[in-house]
Curated annotation (Swiss-Prot):
Phylogenetic classification of the source organism: Bacteria, Bacillati, Bacillota, Clostridia, Eubacteriales
EC number: 4.2.1.20
Protein name: Tryptophan synthase beta chain
Subunit structure: Tetramer of two alpha and two beta chains.
Pfam families: PALP (PF00291)
Keywords of the record: Amino-acid biosynthesis, Aromatic amino acid biosynthesis, Lyase, Pyridoxal phosphate, Tryptophan biosynthesis
Cofactor: pyridoxal 5'-phosphate
GO CC, one annotated term: cytoplasm
HAMAP family the record matches: Trp_synth_beta
NCBIfam families: trpB
Enzyme class: lyase
Amino acid sequence: MDFRTYLKKYPDKNGRFGQYGGAYLTAELIPAFEEIADAYQTICHSSQFINELRRIRKEFQGRPTPVYHCERLSRAIGNCQIYLKREDLNHTGAHKLNHCMGEGLLAKFMGKKRLIAETGAGQHGVALATAAAFFGLECEIHMGEVDIAKQAPNVTRMKILGAKVVPVTHGLKTLKEAVDSAFDSYAKNYKDSIYCIGSALGPHPFPLMVRDFQAVVGYEAKDQFKEMTGFLPDVVTACVGGGSNAAGMFIPFLEEPVDIIGIEPLGRGEKLGDHAASMKYGEKGVMHGFESIMLKDKNGDPAPVYSIASGLDYPSVGPEHAFLRELGRVDYKVINDEEAMEAFFKLSRYEGIIPAIESSHAVAYAMKKAEEMKQGSILVCLSGRGDKDIDYIVEHYGYGEQYFK
């Protein structure tokens, strides 16, 4: 595979990345998603749209976000140098706003009045509520009751921004059920609404759109890292739930001689129901309108999943990630809850940066890899900040003293 031409080839016109992707939809939703795909194909080449998005990123989001050298953390581990792409400094505190502003601008272009979405950790919900406020649109966010309890600050932020938060009370009451609920609402309201999926997954064109809107992360990081150091990193890594921050971070490095590693949540362990490591333990399947690798129960349905990170507990992964692994270009590893928590506290104490639990999985891998590498450099996408997580963490882990004995 020549990755210099990869973006021109994938996805194909049917939204497929090899055997993955596509759009598996009910008859009533096919025209709705075709309308979105057609609108995106028109607007993504428009200089007016591109210029407006650039203006929003600069003036509203505060982009570009910096690349930061973790000198103290690196020194504590050894000679390998760890760098962070600081998406925690993007407006609203995570990478999610990158695609939400793009989706909001698309909705405006299409004449839609409402944005509908699911959220797990609440970051996508906050980002979409922010976009809705910016563009003067209504916003409806579906969120599992378990996540509402865990992520109270983000629920408050969404409501302050004017969003209607719909609690999801069936099943495990987490991210998968929130997606189900949001899909149901969109099916009833698609004529005046747009469904803004929160990751690089779902039916075509969402894996393509979210990747395109998030690629700004990787393009910035690549240029910034080269400017800082004079060379490319040896390893690029990001956490993977659905895979939006990872898709954005990885795409610009595909054609470069760089190891690319996605990090999934191993949670409490290898038993089904104790993790959300789709790539490690999953198999091919269809859910939520797209084909990818998914965790299945004995009946072939989406399996129950768990992660300490609400934004990672999803039983599948974006189709492009499945394809990139199949091509052998990107590798996927796992980090458990305990490793993520150690990274959370160590980054906080050594660098004064409190990361999201999701991002802590990628930081944990970078710390393990740095110890193994002895020298070289690792660039981590720090996908978000940890404000939303601190109450939950302090209640269950205290202030992290156990990691500094």
